[in-house]
Swiss-Prot record:
Residues 1-305, 394-404, 462-476, 569-654 are cytoplasmic. GO terms for molecular function: delayed rectifier potassium channel activity; potassium ion binding; voltage-gated monoatomic ion channel activity involved in regulation of presynaptic membrane potential; voltage-gated potassium channel activity. It is found in: Cell membrane; Cell projection, Axon. Residues 81-99 have a biased composition (Basic residues). The chain crosses the membrane at residues 306-327, 372-393, 405-425, 441-461, 477-498, 540-568. Keywords: Cell membrane, Cell projection, Glycoprotein, Ion channel, Ion transport, Membrane, Phosphoprotein, Potassium, Potassium channel, Potassium transport, Transmembrane, Transmembrane helix, Transport, Voltage-gated channel. Residues 39-146, 630-654 are annotated as: Disordered. One of its GO terms (cellular component) is dendritic spine. It catalyses: K(+)(in) = K(+)(out). It is a multi-pass membrane protein. Residues 463-476 are annotated as: S4-S5 linker. It comes from Mustela putorius furo (European domestic ferret). This is Potassium voltage-gated channel subfamily A member 4.
């Protein structure tokens, strides 16, 4: 492995290797080439001397040998199109072979073809020696094409055809090079082409992973969670399938996925496979600066102090509206309000008694001077103002009206205007009959009931309600299964208890639909007791119904609880991360760009030695580290001394 990597680096193929290690490899390669040239020159000189000593055409032979010597010394830099890497041969061995071979060639062949014969004999000897060296080195050698653009590895594998031995040559491209990854002492080995499938990730990008390379051990070292890396490596091997090991917690594996930079798409798909919904993307802010400030003021209470004040006012108005909605249903307030509404409708036949009607008519009470109506009007004015302002400043009208919270705002406002329009129409049109008045009262009661949805407006300012909403959205499939199982159980046990109680004259189950209520109450383990079986068969059916209800409800509950825990812990971690980011460094004299870089770091460590050095340099260059500030003057305030102490403490930690 090391031989292949060194050879490839000498030709400029292994761009993923660190610069220092590559420079050492190139130096060793240049030294090897220098020894090869010296050995070749010595061998040619010895062969030339032997030929001249034996007689013959010495001048022409000397001229040819000199030419070949020059060519041989220049060949490693650009002579052949395909060169084979071999080890350094002893100089005496080469000299011996050439002295024993060249004299015979000069005796047998004419001087004009002597150079050709010498070259053939020399190449045959070199090929034989190369084959022996390849067998000793594991039958592995390196080759490069004419232009140096493509690096490849050739492996001689034994043939399995039963023909008595032999080897077959197999060529591998540069990406098939094997790479060793050490994760906290556990070594993994894979091919470079496997990691290159995802070039944007930490392991797939040569520049990103270079900082973790250990040149002494020729491997990449990561001080990370070991069980998680099995799934990380499988992500590359499988082409993008990310599966969490059962022995790794969800939050730890999520941190590992973020560290290896597998991407947001892979992380979102992994969370979906785990049963969680996609996180909502942050909505873009308006481009206009004025609209942006208004949007932050009404939409994000944590953005500023005025925004928190507006949020508090909104919560108080919502609570007042809900309290008024509940108080107006009390008997002492409900009777007077119904009478006022009847008078506003233009008559009081059938609705007003003889004592209350003259009193209300003489006092001039109408729906418009009712205290509950006045308070309700004030609340609606605030809700309408808030809704219109947010609609004006929103970055996208389409997304604004698709938001469930904005739909709740519209539903909570509309009943007031419908009620107001109905009252005005009745006052102008006068009484149109008792039947029409009764219908108007029924419609108004339904519309007033819709106001109860205002309580969901609190979820805009409550993290707990938001977590509950996310949990229900993530558990829609489980809730659907629960309702489906309950529906099947209600049908089965309602039919069974009806036929079990059919012969009992005093039974409560007169029909199967009458038994639906009993089945629902029994399966949910509520048990009001208003309907109960009397016969033995009915009691047996009731027992089975209760057991089936417990099992049906218990099955999807763990999934719902798991979703709630996930969203709750995620919200808690976000709050802790925000606090740690805001309180990263307490010394006010540190450079702002240094603090910004430190706070923007998503990892628990700065990760690189250069960043540590930059941190240390920034602390030293800060005002706190100056001797004149920390030591010079005696009239420094206590705050300055504390800041200087903090700066020195930070410098020591770095």
């Amino acid at each position: 492995m090391e031989v292949a990597m060194v050879s490839a680096e000498s030709s400029g193929c292994n761009s993923h290797m660190p610069y220092g290690y590559a420079a050492q490899a190139r130096a060793r390669e240049r030294e090897r080439l220098a020894h090869s040239r010296a050995a070749a020159a010595a061998a040619v000189a010895a062969a030339t001397a032997a030929v001249e000593g034996s007689g013959g055409s010495g001048g022409g032979s000397h001229h040819h040998h000199q030419s070949r010597g020059a060519c041989t010394s220049h060949d490693p830099q650009g002579g052949r199109g395909s060169r084979r890497r071999r080890r350094q041969r002893p100089e005496k061995k080469k000299a011996h072979h050439r002295q024993s071979s060249f004299p015979h060639c000069s005796d047998l062949m004419p001087s004009g073809s002597e150079e050709k014969i010498l070259r053939e004999l020399s190449e045959e000897e070199e090929e034989e020696e190369d084959e022996e060296e390849e067998e000793e080195e594991g039958r592995f050698y390196y080759s490069e094409d004419d232009h140096g653009d493509e690096c490849s590895y050739t492996d001689l594998l034994p043939q399995d055809d039963g023909g008595g031995g032999g080897y077959s040559s197999v060529r591998y491209s540069d990406c098939c090079e094997r790479v060793v990854i050490n994760v906290s002492g556990l070594r993994f080995e894979t091919q470079m082409k496997t990691l290159a499938q995802f070039p944007e990730t930490l392991l797939g990008d040569p520049e990103k992973r270079t900082q973790y390379f250990d040149p002494l051990r020729n491997e990449y070292f990561f001080d990370r969670n070991r069980p998680s890396f099995d799934a990380i490596l499988y992500y590359y091997q499988s082409g993008g399938r990310l599966k969490r090991p059962v022995n790794v917690p969800f939050d730890i594996f999520t941190e590992e996925v973020k560290f290896y930079q597998l991407g947001e798409e892979a992380l979102l798909k992994f969370r979906e496979d785990e049963g969680f919904v996609r996180e909502e993307e942050d909505r873009a802010l308006p481009e206009n600066e004025f609209k942006k400030q208004i949007w932050l003021l009404f939409e994000y209470p944590e953005s500023s102090s005025p925004a928190r004040g507006i949020a508090i006012v909104s919560v108080l108005v919502i609570l007042i509206s809900i309290v008024i909605f509940c108080l107006e249903t009390l008997p002492e307030f409900r009777d007077d309000r119904d009478l006022i509404m009847a008078l506003s409708a233009g008559g009081h036949s059938g609705l007003l008694n003889d004592t209350s009607a003259p009193h209300l008519e003489n006092s001039g009470h109408t729906i418009f001077n009712d205290p509950f109506f006045i308070v309700e009007t004030v609340c609606i004015v605030w809700f309408s103002f808030e809704f219109v302002v947010r609609c004006f400043a929103c970055p996208s009208q389409a997304l604004f009206f698709k938001n469930i919270m904005n739909i709740i705002d519209i539903v909570s406002i509309l009943p007031y205007f419908i009620t107001l329009g109905t009252d005005l129409a009745q006052q102008q049109g006068g009484g149109n009959g008792q039947q029409q008045q009764a219908m108007s009262f029924a419609i108004l009661r339904i519309i007033r009931l819709v106001r109860v949805f205002r309580i969901f407006k609190l979820s805009r300012h409550s993290k707990g309600l938001q977590i509950l909403g996310h949990t229900l959205r993530a558990s829609m499939r489980e809730l659907g299964l629960l309702i489906f199982f309950l529906f099947i159980g209600v049908i089965l046990f309602s039919s069974a208890v009806y036929f079990a109680e059919a012969d009992e004259p005093t039974t409560h189950f007169q029909s199967i639909p009458d038994a639906f209520w009993w089945a629902v109450v029994t399966m949910t383990t509520v048990g009001y007791g208003d309907m109960k079986p009397i016969t033995v068969g009915g009691k047996i059916v009731g027992s089975l119904c209760a057991i089936a209800g417990v099992l049906t409800i218990a099955l999807p509950v763990p999934v719902i609880v798991s979703n709630f825990n996930y969203f709750y812990h995620r919200e808690t971690e976000n709050e802790e991360q925000t606090q740690l980011t805001q309180n990263a460094v307490s010394c006010p004299y540190l450079p702002s760009n240094l603090l910004k870089k430190f706070r923007s770091s998503t990892s628990s460590s700065l990760g690189d030695k250069s960043e540590y050095l930059e941190m240390e340099e920034g602390v030293k260059e800060s005002l706190c580290a100056k001797e004149g500030k920390c030591q010079g003057k005696g009239d420094d305030s206590e705050t300055d001394k504390n800041n200087c102490s903090n700066a020195k403490a930070v410098e020591t930690d770095v």
